[in-house]
């Protein structure tokens, strides 16, 4: 017993001793780890998180970047901070830790014309952004992602129709009749900007969820490499791709939106309308008994959905990505909707130890739209009699489908004896009937593909050979079904089809040599390109006298003879094509990473001009000085970038010119213009107007800018000033009768100038371990003025489209000393309270009467100032963002 007890006590004593030893040993292994965390420039990182991997202890770096934490001697520490790559280190004494910054953009590679460049090596006015860096929001088009995000880029969204396109202007307009749209380059393929019937948005082919980045080239030193297509700037869009060795990743995002009318127009209700007429002494016996809010009858709350799914990854040497998207967008005006399907494929295999790199992209888009007559529906909702009902239970209104309409006696062409009335014209129309009595459906298919091959010469890796071929095909078919009860085509209706298709093929090849000789860094590129564009249009439409057809068919080959139809419209078919041949080159020189020089040249030959005028030549040059790399600023570590930029360049313009306008063409007449020979009528060949003296529009741009970034990307701004002048402006002007085959002609007639200032500002006011506040702001001011103009007998020329309401005439002109597309109006007279007196205008020429000589230029549609503000809050894995944009000084006519 005694031995047993002693044995147990011995075990207990040994166990206790071992426990005390292990505890003391464990206590002895823990140390206090101290360290100092800096960024790539040596500046302390404040608020970085330091954690023991697998443990619960942690610390945060102080204002000097220092930290202290208790950890086992061989423990692993993980240091993380928003905007930096995570880093793991083994615990030790006096650690010196440097984090790699992933948020700073100075060394980001930016896509430019026919190549790439580091952002801090750019010499021209170039802005690159990523959708993830911006306020995400809900977007249905790539153009929505640019609204208010870039200084000097004005994005005016469409009129509310689902899927409607946007008008994008970079530094204002520079042309009268030619295009003011920028050039779009998507994954290396230049996109044909000419929209077809049924297509409203040239960027609709891209799913916004597929976009990796935008690069906007503004000044001529950056855009001249694109020559005649780049007078209005260039927007380069790069889509997302997989990464080599990446595991397959499936991503889904979707959104649901509810759209409503922000604010209805204030109009009189039925009681107020009756009272107003009575006070004016107008007989109200013809008014109805209803109280209809016509705006409520045409507007609705519209629910829309958007779904996107993608899979991306990378085999050993072949990154891939496939994306699918579907958008179901309903408009706030009843009957309007849009459905869009997108798919994209990106493959980027590499071979021969990454010396041979291939990039293949393909995109397909199908869009189906139902268009509503927005303008007429809304306009008539504001003017329609509120005392009338939407529908009337009276046989007299059967001729308009039972809707209330103002009626008139039927015309002589109405053969149906049961059709007693017709819709009256030149009066307000029932807006609900306008929407329901017409059905316009458009189907659009768009497919594009681009194959790029880049070969880095073995044994001479500084030389790259690059070749690419791409194509785009678009087919658009719009069916117009306006039934016989409509007010616009009462009795006959209208049934027609507009079918258009276009395709473009682009091939290019260039060589690029880059090498560094000590402090001299050079990059030389030269190449050639050829593009071909084709367009075909086919239209057919007809109204039908159904009673005449049914009672007197006069069949021809078993079908109704449309020639006997009083509303017959002949078939029309039109096709055309043009080509562009180009040679281009670029030279970049960098001395000591301080002084940068870029020179580019491009020669374009166009089939739209005659021999002797086919070629346009577009040089450009730019200089940049990296002031922060000078010796006197080397020790100023808080400045990341301070760069001065100066640039000059020339670009051209040929869009807006009909193909082969330099030579007479002949068109076949329709059935209404035939020539009789005996008892037979024959269609004729008619010559069209032409101008063999047309030449390129030419735009010369001067640009100066300053880029500044500090505090490791926490603060920065860019400021640019520019002057741009366009000469040999293309515009259609009146000509003397008999001098050509028409009464007007497209000519080179003048010059216009734009100048302005742009400022972009970004800051991170708060940056902590888990929270970041990011703010960006941009503002741009632009002045636009016509300096030369050949006008003929008047000192102005008409422009724009006719206004459908009111005087049904043109209301915009171009005139020397005025902005483009100025409104040409009468000067309103106001009462003592500042309210306009209806129908009373100023007799500006003092001749005692109000006539067209009293009209004057007043305001224009282009804004003087555009600005955008984006603020974003990031807390751990959550973010909240808001975006605002404004345009100031632009006017509309209504």
What are these regions (language model features)?
Residues 50, 79, 184, 390, ...:
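Short aromatic-centered micro-motifs
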Residues 284, 295, 428, 432, ...:
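Extracytoplasmic gating/loop element in the C-terminal half of outer-membrane beta-barrel translocons
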Residues 580, 586-590, 774, 778, ...:
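Exposed, low-structure sequence patches enriched in small/polar residues
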């Amino acid at each position: 017993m005694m031995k047993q007890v002693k044995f147990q006590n011995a075990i207990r004593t040994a166990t206790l001793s071992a426990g005390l030893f292990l505890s003391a040993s464990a206590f002895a292994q823990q140390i206090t780890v101290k360290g100092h965390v800096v960024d790539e420039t040596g500046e302390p990182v404040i608020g970085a998180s330091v954690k023991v991997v697998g443990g619960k202890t942690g610390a945060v770096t102080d204002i000097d970047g220092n930290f202290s934490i208790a950890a086992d001697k061989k423990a692993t520490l993980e240091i993380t901070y928003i905007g930096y790559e995570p880093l793991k280190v083994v615990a030790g004494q006096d650690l010196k830790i440097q984090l790699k910054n992933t948020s700073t953009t100075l060394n980001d590679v930016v896509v430019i014309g026919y190549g790439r460049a580091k952002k801090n090596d750019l010499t021209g006015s170039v802005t690159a952004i990523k959708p993830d860096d911006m306020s995400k929001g809900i977007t249905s088009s790539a153009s929505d992602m640019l609204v208010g995000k870039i200084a000097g880029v004005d994005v005016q969204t469409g009129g509310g129709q689902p899927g409607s396109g946007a008008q994008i202007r970079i530094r204002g307009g520079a042309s009268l009749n030619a295009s003011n749209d920028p050039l779009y380059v998507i994954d290396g393929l230049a996109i044909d900007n000419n929209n077809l019937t049924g297509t409203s948005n040239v960027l609709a082919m891209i799913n916004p969820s597929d976009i990796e980045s935008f690069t906007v080239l503004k000044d001529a030193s950056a855009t001249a490499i694109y020559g005649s297509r780049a007078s209005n700037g260039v927007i380069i869009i790069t889509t997302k791709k997989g990464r080599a060795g990446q595991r397959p990743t499936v991503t889904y995002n979707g959104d649901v939106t509810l759209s409503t009318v922000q604010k209805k127009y204030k109009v009189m209700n039925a009681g107020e309308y009756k009272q107003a007429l009575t006070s004016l002494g107008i007989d109200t016996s013809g008014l109805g008994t209803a109280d209809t809010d016509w705006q409520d009858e045409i507007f609705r709350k519209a629910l829309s959905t958007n779904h996107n799914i993608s899979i991306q990854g990378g085999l050993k040497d072949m990154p891939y990505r496939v994306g699918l998207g579907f958008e179901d967008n309903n408009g706030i005006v009843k009957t309007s909707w849009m459905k869009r399907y997108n798919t994209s494929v990106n493959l980027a295999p590499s071979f021969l130890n990454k010396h041979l790199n291939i990039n293949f992209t393909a995109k397909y888009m199908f869009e189906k739209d139902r268009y509503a007559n927005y303008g007429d529906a809304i306009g008539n909702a504001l003017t329609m009699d509120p005392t009338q009902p939407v529908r009337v239970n009276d046989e007299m209104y059967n001729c308009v489908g039972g809707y209330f309409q103002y009626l008139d006696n039927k015309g002589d062409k109405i053969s149906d004896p049961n059709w007693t009335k017709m819709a009256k014209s030149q009066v307000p129309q029932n807006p609900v009937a306008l929407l329901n009595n017409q059905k316009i459906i458009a189907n659009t298919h768009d497919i594009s593909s681009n194959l790029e091959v880049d070969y880095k010469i073995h044994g001479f890796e500084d030389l790259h050979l690059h070749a690419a071929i791409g194509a785009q095909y678009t087919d658009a078919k719009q069916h117009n079904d306006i039934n016989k009860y409509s007010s616009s085509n009462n009795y006959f209706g209208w049934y027609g089809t507009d079918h258009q298709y276009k395709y473009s093929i682009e091939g290019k090849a260039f060589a690029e040599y880059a090498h560094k000789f000590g402090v001299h860094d050079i990059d030389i590129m030269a190449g050639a390109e050829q593009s071909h564009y084709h367009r075909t249009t086919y239209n057919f439409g007809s109204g039908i006298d159904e009673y005449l057809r049914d009672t007197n068919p006069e069949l021809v080959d078993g079908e109704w003879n449309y020639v006997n139809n009083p509303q017959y419209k002949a078939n029309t078919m039109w096709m055309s094509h043009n080509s562009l041949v180009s040679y281009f080159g670029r030279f970049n020189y960098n001395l000591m990473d301080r002084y940068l020089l870029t020179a580019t040249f491009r020669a374009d030959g166009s089939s739209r001009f005659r021999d002797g005028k086919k070629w346009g030549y577009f040089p450009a040059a730019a200089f940049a000085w990296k002031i922060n790399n000078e010796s006197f600023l080397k020790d100023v570590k808080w400045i990341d970038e301070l760069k001065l930029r100066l640039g000059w360049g020339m670009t051209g313009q040929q869009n807006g010119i009909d193909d082969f306008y330099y030579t007479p063409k002949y068109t076949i007449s329709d059935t209404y213009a035939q020539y009789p020979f005996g008892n037979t009528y024959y269609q004729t060949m008619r010559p069209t107007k032409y101008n063999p003296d047309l030449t390129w529009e030419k735009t010369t741009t001067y640009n100066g800018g300053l880029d500044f970034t500090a505090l490791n990307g926490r603060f920065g701004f860019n400021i640019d000033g520019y002057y741009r002048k366009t000469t040999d402006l293309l515009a259609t002007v009146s000509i003397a009768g008999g001098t050509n085959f028409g009464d007007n002609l497209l000519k080179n007639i003048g010059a216009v100038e734009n100048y302005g200032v742009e400022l972009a500002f970004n800051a991170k006011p708060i940056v902590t371990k888990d929270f970041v506040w990011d703010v960006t702001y941009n503002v741009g001011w632009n002045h636009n003025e016509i300096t030369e103009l050949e006008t003929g007998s008047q000192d102005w020329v008409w422009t724009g489209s006719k206004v459908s309401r009111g005087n049904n005439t043109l209301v915009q002109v171009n005139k020397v000393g005025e902005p483009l597309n100025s409104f040409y109006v009468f000067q309103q007279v106001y009462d003592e309270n500042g309210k306009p007196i209806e129908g009373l205008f100023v007799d500006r020429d003092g001749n005692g009467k109000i006539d067209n000589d009293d009209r004057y230029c007043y305001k224009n549609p282009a804004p003087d100032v555009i600005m955008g503000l984006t603020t974003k809050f990031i807390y751990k894995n959550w973010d909240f963002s808001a975006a605002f944009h404004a345009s100031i000084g632009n006017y509309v006519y209504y």
